[in-house]
Amino acid sequence: MTPTLLPDVAVGIGLRQPHYREVFERRPALGFLEVHSENFFLDGGASMHALERARAAYPVSLHGVGLSLGSADRLADAHLAKLKRLVERIEPAIVSEHLCWGGVGGVHFNDLLPLPHTGETLALLAARIGRVQDELGRTILVENLSAYVEFRDGDMTETAFLAELARRTGCGLLLDINNLYVNAVNFGFDPVARLAELAASSIGQMHLAGHTVTDDCLIDTHGSAVCDPVWALYDEA
């Protein structure tokens, strides 16, 4: 299988439409560009033209939000086929997906919903990730989620769950530092101790982002600057 193809240290950004002019005209010194896979499932048009321009200048990371790896529904064949076609066209350095579910009964909820960290969930995800990797002919990264509920029947921590999933499938991890911090504050655990449950060799990419502070909890909104505690946690990672 094709591994991830970035240097050991590369700093990139999430490419959005407001960035196009600066990226294409000034060519800033970036290690890579990350885009949401689903925004480029059409074979042509302005979006695909922009992505091909980006790919000509930088390595690209395809980050999925809609494969719904943990859904009780079967894996969406049409979605996976579109992703495969995009991967073959763009030849990205990294392919990643959120570790979540986002639909059931054929209805897509347009959200990234958490999963119970149980052996049953682990077996389901291992099979799904194995199929995706076989179909794409490459390893993928899976990303830890921000969550606002905990399941009573969970029998392992999220990071222990991620570590075992990587061991079983050979997939890598996209470690979202902000998501880990948000969950640590909301559920009252030590995020540094959780980092110790992950093998550094399994982490293929990290995300840094901001969150919103409310009276009740932290919400992962990507709507503010990265805060000092998240930077400190990144230093620990």
Describe the function of each predicted region.
Residues 76-173:
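Active-site acidic/histidine proton-transfer and metal-coordination neighborhood
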Residues 20, 37-49, 68-78, 148-156, ...:
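Acidic-and-aromatic substrate-binding clefts and catalytic sites of carbohydrate-active enzymes
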Residues 42-44, 74, 112-118, 122, ...:
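Gly/Pro-rich active-site loop or hairpin
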